[in-house]
Regions:
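Bacterial N-terminal signal peptides
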Residues: 7-15
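Acidic Gly/Asp/Thr-rich repetitive segments characteristic of extracellular carbohydrate-active
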Residues: 26-64, 68-69
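Right-handed parallel beta-helix
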Residues: 63, 86, 92-93, 110-121, ...
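Extracellular beta-strand/beta-solenoid scaffold signature
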Residues: 72-77, 100-104, 127-148, 163-172, ...
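C-terminal beta-strand-rich structural cap/linker in extracellular carbohydrate-active enzymes
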Residues: 385-407
Length: 407
């Protein structure tokens, strides 16, 4: 009987920790010496940097306003949660938190979930192309964005990242992250050689990097929506890339100079964006590429010893189109009132009827938002009738964020 007592005590302690998980508050004019309450908030740097009493299971709430620091615009994140008690970083309920700069996730961060923040750089781009290369001295603006250097089991959920020099960087020492539901647009700059900066630039070896349910578009030729790439000295292994919407400009690449393995690419929806799996490596091991839709672009799979291709739809710009329309409505596993929609409007009709597949009920209403203006006014509104919503579409393709109000 006595051998069971430590188990009971440990279980009780864990239950009490979950019960007493705390909400802490930060604001742009907070201070490290404050109490971390709504009335006496911390500053963002000390809270995210692990210099406060934040424990596994706690939540850091960012009070509404803009968080900005110059120089050193990236706020370090050094927080340690547990797999079953992550630390959450998010806006205070009902508020909008903006980071004019960015975040850098550093070791020993673990099991941190960063939700619903807007990350951007307010300084304008130069009015003419700057010097060639990836680090031009005459660019002269903060880098901004979200940069992952050393977290384990962290999640980056429903972030809006725009007008940075690079949207997301996710490097080899970031283990088992999930990038989910992020809207990434208008990042990068123009050099005299080409466009630079990508929606997501990433490398990986150990663990699996998951990139799912994101909407990505680039403003410049030379930038990539997904740039999972490295030289012969870098690693591009073990990716799960699913249910993303990429359009406009910005090729979708997974591959580099070193052989890759463990590449899985499922149900991505591209328009005006080509997909390339494999780059300059003399050989690659295994990839699984299924159920992707690529319109006005190509699918290239290069130098794989084992490549599974199944149920992909690839239509070049001059290829015959099907009749009618194809719509893809994606649920959001972290926010039931957020949906993403991609529409291939083959017939170029003014409106398209979209089947909701049970994601909406009769009487539910949605606001359709432009992904590049998700905090602005809706493009349109619609009400679900008979498991269907009718939406406006201009041209062959449209992408929307749907904000749902349940009946």
């Amino acid at each position: 009987m006595s051998s069971c007592k430590p188990v009971v005590v440990i279980t009780l302690l864990l239950s009490m920790q979950r019960l007493y998980a705390a909400d802490w508050y930060v604001s742009p004019d907070g201070a490290a010496t404050n109490a971390g309450t709504r009335q006496s908030p911390w500053d963002i740097g000390s809270a995210l940097g692990g210099r406060e009493e934040i424990k596994a299971g706690d939540t850091i709430c960012l009070l509404e306003r803009t968080y900005r620091r110059r120089p050193n615009e990236l706020f370090d994140v050094r927080l340690k949660g547990l797999a079953d008690q992550p630390i959450h970083v998010r806006p205070a309920p009902g508020q909008r938190a903006r980071i004019d700069g960015g975040l850098a996730v550093q070791s020993p961060s673990s099991h941190v979930w960063i939700h619903d923040l807007e990350i951007f750089v307010s300084e304008p781009l130069p009015d003419k192309p700057v010097s060639a290369g990836s680090s031009p001295a005459d660019l002269k603006r903060p880098w901004g964005g979200l940069h992952m250097h050393g977290g384990t089991g962290c999640k980056y959920i429903n972030l809006v990242i725009h007008n940075c020099n690079q949207g997301i960087s996710c490097w080899k020492d970031e283990i088992d992250p999930e990038v989910y539901g992020c809207i990434i647009y208008d990042n990068g700059w123009v050099g005299v050689d080409r466009g630079h900066g990508h929606c997501i630039y990433t490398q990986n070896d150990e663990g699996v990097k998951t990139i799912s349910n994101c909407i990505m578009t680039c403003p410049f030729d030379g930038s990539y929506t997904l740039h999972a790439y490295g030289s012969e000295r870098a690693y591009v292994n073990n990716y799960l890339v699913t249910d993303n919407i990429c359009y406009g400009k910005g090729p979708f690449l997974i591959g580099g100079g070193r052989p890759s393995h463990g590449i899985r690419v499922y149900r991505n929806y591209l328009h005006g964006v080509g997909m390339r799996i494999g780059y300059s490596a003399p050989y690659n091991e295994d990839c699984d590429v299924r159920e992707n839709v690529i319109v006005n672009g190509r699918l290239e799979i290069a130098n794989y010893r084992k490549a599974v291709q199944q149920d992909n739809v690839v239509l070049a710009g001059n290829a015959a189109r099907p009749m009618g329309a194809k719509s893809i409505l994606l649920p959001n596993k972290y926010d039931p009132n957020r949906l993403y929609l991609a529409v291939y409007n083959w017939g170029k009709a003014d409106t398209v009827d979209v089947k909701t597949g049970g994601l909406l009920r009769d009487g539910d209403t949605v606001e359709l938002l432009d992904p590049r203006n998700v905090f602005g006014d809706p493009v349109a509104r619609a009400t679900c009738r008979g498991d269907t919503i009718r939406i406006p579409v201009q041209g062959e393709f449209a992408a929307y964020v749907l904000r749902v109000s349940r009946k």
